[in-house]
Design a protein with these regions (language model features):
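Secretory targeting and sorting signals
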Residues: 1-12
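Surface-exposed, glycine-biased beta-strand/turn segments
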Residues: 10-91, 100-101, 129-130, 139, ...
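Active-site region of chymotrypsin-like
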Residues: 49-52, 87-124
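Beta-strand/loop nucleic-acid-binding surfaces
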Residues: 95-104, 215-244
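Short nucleic-acid-contacting surface segments enriched for D/E, G, S/T with interspersed K/R
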Residues: 118-127, 237-258
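Flexible glycine-rich surface loops and low-complexity tracts that mediate binding to linear polymers
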Residues: 136, 248-275
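A short hydrophobic beta-strand segment most commonly corresponding to one strand
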Residues: 149-158
Length: 285
């Protein structure tokens, strides 16, 4: 039999398609400070641990690891308030033990609904963007009474779960999370790392995003464009009146506060890219 390329019948001679793989880099699924170890496969009463527990404050924002479609799961006494993210790569992600409290206490008075467990306004079956807020960290299900955390699982091609630790280690931590296109302003504080006539690289120690009021400590180098319209000043204390300064006067290691100009939210901006300063305050030395 002679096979003509592209004309195989009933699959004869076809090369099976390679199984879908997770993206090399995912958005880290929790915003802000976290603690976690590689506890995948660790002994548990119900069998080996199938995910990674990411410890985070109550109601910390759980974020979409990649773009995809979500499904609420509310009927598991073990998982509590849970969500599936069916990623565009073919990977399925599990978000387990989301919040079910209505107060700062462990009251268990909330339901697995948008605004309590899931992001406000999020609908079951919705398509989501990478980095979009999906829900809130909690301790529902059999995690009740324990430390608040996100039990995170990664299932390539929707199959058996694998150790998500390598993806978390290389995951992209966001500076903030907001709806695409909504206006934001950042208050970045840290020290000068490098400077040119129109850019400032800082070693950021903290960031606060407005008007979302999302603040977190950082240890991250961030490059900020400084257009000619930006105000550059020297101050004797952060928040105090300043005197005009030249950006090139900034010295490595000098303390600095940068306010970015109001801009529409994009994933690139959430990652710390395409930021433009409106005010640069250099602490006098």
């Amino acid at each position: 039999m002679t096979l003509v390329a592209g004309s195989a019948t009933a699959g004869y001679g076809r090369v099976p398609a390679a199984p879908a793989q997770p993206p090399q880099t995912i958005v880290f699924p929790v915003l802000g400070p976290v603690e976690y170890i590689d506890d995948f496969g660790a002994p548990r009463p119900g069998g080996p641990h199938q995910g990674i527990d990411i410890l985070a404050p109550k109601r910390a924002l759980a974020l979409a690891a990649e773009a995809g479609k979500i499904k609420f799961w509310t009927s598991s006494a073990t998982a509590g308030c849970m969500l599936y993210l069916y990623g565009a790569s073919g990977t399925t992600y599990y978000y387990i033990h989301l919040n079910n409290d209505l107060t700062a206490k462990n009251d268990n008075k909330g339901k697995c609904v948008a605004g309590t467990a899931y992001a406000k306004g999020l609908k079951n079956g919705a398509k989501v963007a990478a980095g979009q807020v999906l829900g809130y960290v909690g301790n529902s299900g059999d995690a009740d009474g324990g430390p608040t955390h996100l039990h995170f699982e990664l299932h390539p091609n929707g199959g058996k779960g694998v150790d998500a630790y390598p993806w978390l280690q290389s995951g992209q931590h966001l500076l903030f999370a907001s709806g695409r296109g909504t206006a934001f302003t950042l208050d970045l504080r840290g020290t000068v790392s490098a400077v040119t006539a129109d850019t400032l690289r800082i070693k950021a120690a903290s960031v606060t995003a407005w008007p979302m009021r999302q603040g977190q400590p950082l240890s991250l180098k961030v490059l900020v464009n400084v257009p000619s319209s930006a105000i550059v000043q020297t101050v004797k204390g952060m928040g105090k009146p300043g005197t005009p300064a030249d950006l090139l006067d900034a010295k490595p290691g000098q303390k600095v506060q940068v306010w970015t100009g109001a801009a529409p939210t994009t994933l690139k901006a959430e990652r710390g890219g395409a930021l433009n300063a409106s005010l640069v305050s250099l602490l006098g030395r």
